[in-house]
Regions:
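Bulky hydrophobic segments
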Residues: 1-102, 108, 112-134
Length: 134
């Protein structure tokens, strides 16, 4: 089951990368049409995509081992912050895109919400797994 979930997480990463490539090549109209269906428009899309990626990658790979040590959720969050920053910054180099500090803040908000959901979920699981104290 974990391998299936990891495959889904990687598929989501590829889909996100494909959306970025389309936007960088000037197919921004497709992205804008899609963002009309997301509450909050483009800002909501940044929150949803970065939050979902962070949460799904964290759930799928936080216990994975890389070079003998556990990857951990905090490293995944650090990678997502770096990814969001670099993705927004690279838009300065693209003819059809522009850097937006607002978009970057909404990407960070999505990551922060994913961290909150992950931490609350872990606490709830720990509470339900521990024996009831009477």
């Amino acid at each position: 089951m974990l391998n299936l979930f990891r495959g889904l997480a990687l598929f989501l990463c590829v889909g996100t990368a494909w959306g970025i490539v389309l936007a960088n090549q000037g197919d921004i109209l497709t992205v804008r049409q899609f963002s009309k269906h997301v509450p909050g428009g483009d800002a909501g899309l940044h929150v949803a995509v970065m939050g979902t990626l962070t949460l799904v990658l964290g759930l799928a790979f936080s216990e994975a081992r890389v070079f003998g040590s556990r990857l951990g959720f905090s490293r995944i969050v650090a990678l997502m912050i770096a990814f969001a920053t670099l993705e927004e910054w690279q838009q300065r180099l693209q003819p059809f895109r522009r850097f937006s500090f607002r978009d970057l803040l909404f990407s960070y908000l999505g990551i922060a919400l994913a961290v909150l959901v992950f931490m609350l979920g872990r606490r709830l699981l720990a509470r339900f797994r521990s024996p009831d104290r009477e």
